[in-house]
């Protein structure tokens, strides 16, 4: 459903020169699977998510979503995805119902079909109690549910969650993870980007560990623990990053010695 091959994104900076935000990243995600991208802030996770959602164009590499190329078929990609982040804008003057309805119209959904879909979503996400509440009076949890509903309104096969629990209280974050699990059970293809290790441990079928634009390793939790001979996932994560940084320093030392 999602295929990424040697994806690279480079920025030109007048003071620093070229900066590689994403460096030859490759992975695939199947329907009915939650694929976790785990990394610290600045690891390149959001850049990958934005390329997959067609907001950014890759410098090199290939990415397809539901069989559509993110460059050549950008409009089709957008029809097949829903995107949820921690900073999705909510309109202060529109109610929860009006906002989700508006996005359904943007996707060209017929009126009767859209109304049925909204009724289903508002029941599924327990939003009926604030369906007429304007954005300016919503709690953080309410706003996040609206973000999820408008990402799901057109029933896309692929859903992307980019640091979606950031800034949420424990209860709201827990409810969001429950929604993600339900989406997996319904056969959706899901990417879940986070810097919180406990979330990927509890939620994701497979995990890719990112650092400085690269995927250092990927696999199931069992595979990663076996490969690195470490049961403590936090120790595994930081050990992998530490070894990668040491290798980079050794490489730089060798280059400096040659020059």
Spans of model-derived segments:
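Conserved catalytic motifs of ABC-family nucleotide-binding domains
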Residues: 155
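A short, flexible loop at the N-terminus of ABC-type nucleotide-binding domains that lies
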Residues: 1-4, 10-24, 31, 73-74
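Catalytic Walker B motif of ABC-type/P-loop ATPase nucleotide-binding domains
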Residues: 159-163
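Conserved ABC ATPase signature
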Residues: 134-138
């Amino acid at each position: 459903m999602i295929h990424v091959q040697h994806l690279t994104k480079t920025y030109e900076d007048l003071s620093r020169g070229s900066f590689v935000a994403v460096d030859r990243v490759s992975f695939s995600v199947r329907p009915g699977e939650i694929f976790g991208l785990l990394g610290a802030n600045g690891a390149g996770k959001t850049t990958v998510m934005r390329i997959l959602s067609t907001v950014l164009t890759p410098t090199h590499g290939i990415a397809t979503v539901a069989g559509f190329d993110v460059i050549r078929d950008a409009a089709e990609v957008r029809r097949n995805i829903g995107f949820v982040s921690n900073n999705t804008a909510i309109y202060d003057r529109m109610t929860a119902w009006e906002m989700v309805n508006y996005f359904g119209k943007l996707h060209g959904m017929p009126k009767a079909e859209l109304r049925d879909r909204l009724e289903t979503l508002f029941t599924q996400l327990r939003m009926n109690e604030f369906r007429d509440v304007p954005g300016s009076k919503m709690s953080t949890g309410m706003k996040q549910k609206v973000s999820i509903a408008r990402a799901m309104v057109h029933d896309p096969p692929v859903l992307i969650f980019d640091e979606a629990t950031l800034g949420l209280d424990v209860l709201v974050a827990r409810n969001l993870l429950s929604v993600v699990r339900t989406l997996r059970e319904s056969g959706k293809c899901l990417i879940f980007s986070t810097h919180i290790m406990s979330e990927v441990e509890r939620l994701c079928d497979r995990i890719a560990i990112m650092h400085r634009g690269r995927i250092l390793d990927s696999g199931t939790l069992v595979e990663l623990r076996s490969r690195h001979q470490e049961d403590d996932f936090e120790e595994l994560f930081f050990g992998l990053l530490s070894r990668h940084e040491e290798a980079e320093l050794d490489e730089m030392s060798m280059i400096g010695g040659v020059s």
